[in-house]
Amino acid sequence: MDKSQGVLLSSNVGAGSRPWPELLGSAHWDGLLDPLDLTLRRLILLCGDLCQVTYDSFNSDSHSKYCGTCRFSRSTLLDRTQFPAAGDLSVAAYLYATSDATAFPGSMVYSMSREAWSKESNWIGYVAVSNDAAAAASGQRVIYVAWRGTIRSLEWVDVLKPDLVDHDDILPEGHPGRGRSRVMKGWYLIYSSTDERSPFSKYSARDQMLAAVRELVARYRNESLGVVCTGHSLGASLATLCAFDIVVNGVSKVGDGAHIPVTAVVFGSPQIGNPEFKKQFEEQPNLRALHVRNMPDLIPLYPSGLLGYANVGKTLQVDSKKSPYVKRDTSPGDYHNLQGILHTVAGWNGKDGEFKLQVKRSVALVNKSSGFLKDSNLVPESWWVERNKGMVLGQNGEWQLEGPAEENLPVPPVVTGKIIDDDVAAVATSSSAKEDKKTGKGSKLLSGLIDQLLCVPDTCKAGAA
């Protein structure tokens, strides 16, 4: 990855550049999308790379006892995944989710081992914050919430029921959306479900996220603050819900003062809720959403207005077919692949402009979890893999799956009391890291179309959904 992108949080933001409020959508990105502003382009890519971290670090091997976990500790996550701005951010909290397997097929993966770390929970994302050096250079302390998308192929779309449910449980008393605003059941269950059987899901992913963000807002209340929620595919839906939740429940309010800006920057997002949810979202004065959509990608059309859904926020539409580096005849999953979208953003010069990379970004990243690049680029398909798929030769001469080092073992989240320990707080303030329901009516209206258009090979890897 392009390590120079790390300067986004320092020299590229501030004097002579777009101020943070504009980047976070204070003016709804008017004049910044066409042509695409360079600093906004870098911010979008940074958010996309934060999403990619969730794919690159997730253990999806069902043979492993630790399937469903993050492979790395909070203190090493960004470095081990070669995140380009690792020196500017510190990971403050991990998020874990649970859900009924029938609510969202493919969203959770579990170990086949009897000694599995958990049979109920999956790692679903993380909360990070800019450190002192980056905050001082940019004049803005930014809290990032990154949500993981699905690991399975796009076949989930064919079996997922697009039922709409109310989300009154997360709306404050007296909120005008109570009983009217509805979101897809699958997204909502992953976001809000708990399972007492698992120490990782005694609190919902929502509760874990709110506790972490609330703590960071309180810690940095005297600084210029912003919150960015980001995700791809399923993660985009969770990020949109998350941003809305932070605002309507007052987590973005600093004491008795004004609300800080909260922005969802999402990629390849399915539709989240009904027109009332859209209305309630867009009426919040400090809440924005920017959806980066690849035009040939079909997922953002799902479930569709025919089933009672509406798009939320502003859309930056790009078209990967303009890139000379990628295949023209490819599977639908490639158009939805996160790295394919980020590659297109890096070279996007408008629908009438010629594709030309505007920032230094390796073309090889496109094939990180796909075969989207033309063979003439000489980049192997799906090249981001664990060495020997995690197999090691033991002293007894037997090959076996290697477990994580002690510092990388999953640790249950703490939500009550002080949720960010002193070591992690020190990391956040240092430029060098230390150790850290009501169901609506579903519909099969789209099933025939989906059968035809989303027939994705089983070889679809992480980042394709």
From Swiss-Prot:
EC top class named in words: hydrolase
Localization per Swiss-Prot or TrEMBL: Cytoplasm
GO molecular function per UniProt: phospholipase A1 activity
Signal sequence region: none
Alphabetized UniProt keyword annotations: Cytoplasm, Hydrolase, Lipid degradation, Lipid metabolism
Superkingdom to which the source organism belongs: Eukaryota
InterPro entries noted in UniProt: AB_hydrolase_fold, Fungal_lipase-type, PLA
GO process terms (BP): cellular response to UV-B; lipid catabolic process; UV protection
Active site annotation, chain numbering: S233 (acyl-ester intermediate), S233 (charge relay system), D297 (charge relay system), H336 (charge relay system)
Function: Acylhydrolase that catalyzes the hydrolysis of phospholipids at the sn-1 position.
Family: Belongs to the AB hydrolase superfamily. Lipase family.
Entry protein name: Phospholipase A1-II 5
Native source species: Oryza sativa subsp. japonica
